[in-house]
A protein has these predicted regions:
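N-terminal membrane-targeting/pre-transmembrane regions
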Residues: 1-41
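Hydrophobic, well-ordered secondary-structure segments
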Residues: 2, 7-8, 48-49, 70, ...
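A generic structural signal for short, non-catalytic loop/turn and secondary-structure boundary residues
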Residues: 4-6, 62-64, 123, 137
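Hydrophobic alpha-helical transmembrane segments
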Residues: 39-52
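Conserved beta-hairpin
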Residues: 52-97
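Short strand-connecting beta-turns/loops that link adjacent beta-strands
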Residues: 76, 135-137, 149
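Non-transmembrane, membrane-adjacent beta-strand/coil modules in membrane-associated proteins
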Residues: 82-143
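Cytosol-/stroma-facing membrane-proximal "stalk/adaptor" domains immediately downstream
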Residues: 140-161
Length: 161
């Protein structure tokens, strides 16, 4: 696998990290939990609650921030979309479109096909939809949150509608 990644050319990369305000909110929640833990108890209860709840908060925020969106080109010229652990060759994408913030709710609502591959991050306002034409794959389309959907689709090299 290491030799495969060395031969791939990175065309686009995006880390989907949680907003800074989430870290501030988590710090406030950790402080409240620690303060409540020491009420009527020795001071060590404050420190234990601070360390435990702080570690859990940091782990949760890092866990939510782990998704990465990349577009690469392999040595044969095939472009690939990587979203988290999934990989999609551009050759199976029939058409693609940018979903603006105003249409995000509709795209994620009743119209959503249960067989679709969805990577949704609530704090990212825009999405990209890639309709697939692959007889070997039952997935009708990919719906992914991305900060720059136009750039992702342009780098993938497929028609944008």
């Amino acid at each position: 696998m290491a030799s495969d990644t060395q031969q791939e050319k990175l065309l686009y990369s995006e880390h989907q990290r949680v907003p800074l305000v989430w870290w501030l909110f988590a710090a406030g929640v950790v402080a409240i939990i620690a303060w409540q833990a020491q009420m009527g108890r020795p001071m060590w209860a404050f420190y234990v609650a601070l360390v435990v709840s702080g570690a859990l908060a940091v782990w949760a925020l890092i866990y939510f921030s782990r998704t990465k969106v990349e577009v690469t080109e392999d040595s044969s010229g095939e472009r690939w979309l990587h979203v988290g652990p999934a990989r999609l060759p551009a050759s199976v994408v029939n058409r693609s479109l940018v979903i603006p913030p105003t249409a995000k709710r509709a795209a994620m609502g009743r119209q959503l096909d249960p067989a679709a591959y969805v990577v949704h991050k609530n704090w990212i306002p825009t999405m990209a939809m890639l309709v697939l034409d692959d007889p070997d794959d039952p997935t009708p389309y990919w719906l992914i949150s991305t900060k720059e959907p136009q750039e992702v689709l342009e780098q993938l090299g497929r028609p944008i509608y």
